[in-house]
UniProtKB/Swiss-Prot annotation:
UniProt name for this protein: Uncharacterized gene 52 protein
Source species, domain of life: Viruses
Pfam families from the UniProt entry: Herpes_BLRF2
UniProt record similarity statement: Belongs to the herpesviridae BLRF2 family.
InterPro entries: Herpes_BLRF2
């Protein structure tokens, strides 16, 4: 009795697998039709690399903006208590965009320091 049921389950799973393979093939064809010939499909690793690169660029720009704001708020202060009080109440909203990050990579290389 158990063997009949397991055979039926295996057959059902095989049918489902075939159905999914056909559906997958159709979706791949549809995907290729909607991309231009010059454009390449990304692998998951390539997509991950693009995402990481974008996050790193945005993070770097956000860090620069935060540093500027903290310096502006803390630099005029003279005592440790004033600084700690100011830092405790820091609340910034920072806007960053990819357009800003491209300006970072286009700026000219800085000259080395001379003594």
């Amino acid at each position: 009795m158990a063997s009949r049921r397991s055979c039926a389950d295996v057959e059902e799973l095989e049918k489902e697998l075939q159905k999914l393979k056909i559906e997958n093939k159709a979706l791949k064809k549809k995907l290729v039709q909607h991309t231009s010939p010059e454009d390449e499909l990304l692998t998951p690793a390539q997509k991950d690399a693009i995402i990481n690169s974008t996050v790193n660029k945005l993070t770097k720009k956000a860090e620069e903006k935060i540093r500027e704001r903290v310096l502006k708020d803390v630099l005029p202060l003279v005592s440790k208590n004033q600084c700690m009080e100011a830092i405790a109440h820091i609340k910034y909203r920072i806007d960053v965009s990819i357009d800003e990050t491209y300006n970072l990579s286009r700026r000219p290389a800085s000259k080395p320091r001379t003594k």
